[in-house]
A protein has these predicted regions:
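Short beta-strand segments enriched in small/hydrophobic residues
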Residues: 25-30, 66-81, 190-196
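Flexible loop/hinge segments that line or gate small-molecule binding clefts
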Residues: 130-178, 219, 258, 284-296
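Short acidic capping loops at alpha-helix termini that bridge into adjacent secondary structure
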Residues: 190, 221-225, 273-279
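N-terminal helix-turn-helix/winged-helix DNA-binding helices
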Residues: 2-13, 52-86, 101, 124-126
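Flexible loop/turn connectors
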Residues: 241-354
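Central regulatory/effector-binding core of bacterial HTH transcription factors
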Residues: 96-140
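Hinge/beta->alpha junction and helix N-cap segments in small-molecule ligand-binding domains
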Residues: 79-89, 107-116, 138, 168-178, ...
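Extreme N-terminal segment that seeds HTH/winged-HTH DNA-binding domains in transcriptional regulators
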Residues: 1-21, 350, 354
Length: 354
């Protein structure tokens, strides 16, 4: 913790370097990896390297070459990849962790097709991969394919109700609770919540955390302050207008950042000033969050760390307990939640048990 009471992340990320340099993460990656065939100007390269030096950025694994460069492979199986930025983030985490041991990552997208899953798992068994990560874009219960039992396997962002495999998911209830606590700590009492679609477990659990924080603070859970959205800007916009028509809240907690985008638009249409007259909190910490005006306070989904955890469990060689780890979701405090603070990441140091 710094002298001014703010808390900073322990490691500078490539995302922060890109923001500091005013370029994309892809550009930072190409510059740092020495891709001279890319048409990146000398000025852009200079800006990236300057940002790296000023922020003290060190790639994960820097100074720690692979223990033994080999040809081992971890198979990673997702139902979808292209529909979400979080899959690529988790894959990066797996690659970083696996490469420390000289192991590569092979990714397939199955579309949830059981026949395709079976074919891939048979191939990986023949290839004698180190293990398999079975993942889902949406946090949910799954019925893992039978052939997964041939492999050393873990589940990512999903869980097996029969507890046959170890799994890791975000601690969504605790994330929702912590976000609401930040709004309460900022002095807000009439705190509204815009949920996602009710069939999504993540949305339900974030709302449970919101309600838990209100009750713990002695505040009522008012049904009039809870409105269903759709995880899209359009849903956040429509839900915010409904909330304003029912009576002005002090703060609005949106169950994801995309709905917060629509919430911003609706508030500005009604003459409100985000972070001043009405506070807003998001969830996910998508790229757009830091570029909103004011920058959006939100909650980070730990997909990179989840990916690292999966690769580490596959490679550690010891038996993997068939339990579900709920990984902490840090609050990312910027300027929309009603406190005048510098951008800071507050890391919870525990995992959700409830």
């Amino acid at each position: 913790m710094q002298d001014d009471g703010t808390t900073c992340s322990a490691r500078v990320t490539m995302k922060e370097v890109a923001h500091h340099a005013g370029v994309s993460q892809s550009t930072v990656s190409f510059v740092l990896n020495g891709n001279d065939d890319m048409r990146i100007s000398a000025e852009t390269r200079r800006k990236v390297l300057k940002a790296v030096a000023e922020l003290g950025y060190r790639p994960r694994g820097a100074g720690r070459p692979p223990k033994a460069v080999g040809h081992g492979v971890i198979g990673v199986m997702f139902d979808e990849v292209a529909t979400s930025p979080f899959a690529s983030i988790s894959i990066e985490g797996m690659q970083e962790e696996a490469w420390k041991s000289g192991v590569l990552v092979e990714v397939v997208m199955t579309g949830g097709d059981p026949n395709y899953e079976a074919a891939v798992l048979r191939k990986w068994a023949a290839d004698r991969v180190e293990g398999v990560v079975y993942g889902s874009i949406l946090t949910r219960r799954v019925a893992p394919p039978e052939l997964l039992s041939r492999h050393r396997a873990v589940l990512m962002n999903c869980y097996d109700p029969e507890a046959r495999y170890a799994s890791v998911v975000p601690a969504e209830r605790r994330g929702g609770e912590a976000a609401t606590q930040e709004l309460i700590a900022a002095g807000h009492r009439r705190i509204a919540f815009i949920s996602g679609e009710p069939w999504m477990e993540a949305s339900d659990q974030r709302m449970e955390g919101y309600e838990r924080a209100l009750r713990a603070a002695g505040l009522p859970v008012d049904p009039a302050l809870i409105v269903e959205g759709n995880f899209l800007p359009s849903g956040g916009h429509a839900a915010t207008l409904r909330l304003l028509d029912r009576g002005r809240p002090d703060a609005i907690f949106c169950a994801n950042d995309l709905m917060a985008v629509g919430c911003y638009e609706a508030l500005k249409e009604r003459g409100e000033r985000v972070g001043e007259t009405i506070a807003v909190m998001g969830y996910d910490d998508q790229e757009i969050a830091q570029h909103l005006n004011p920058p959006l306070s939100t909650v980070l989904l730990p997909h990179r760390e989840m990916g690292q955890w999966c690769a580490a469990r596959i490679l550690e060689g010891t038996p993997i307990p068939s339990t579900t780890l709920r990984m902490a979701c840090p609050s990312v405090l910027r300027n929309s939640h009603g406190k005048r603070q510098t951008s800071a990441v507050i890391y919870q140091t525990f995992d959700e048990k409830r």
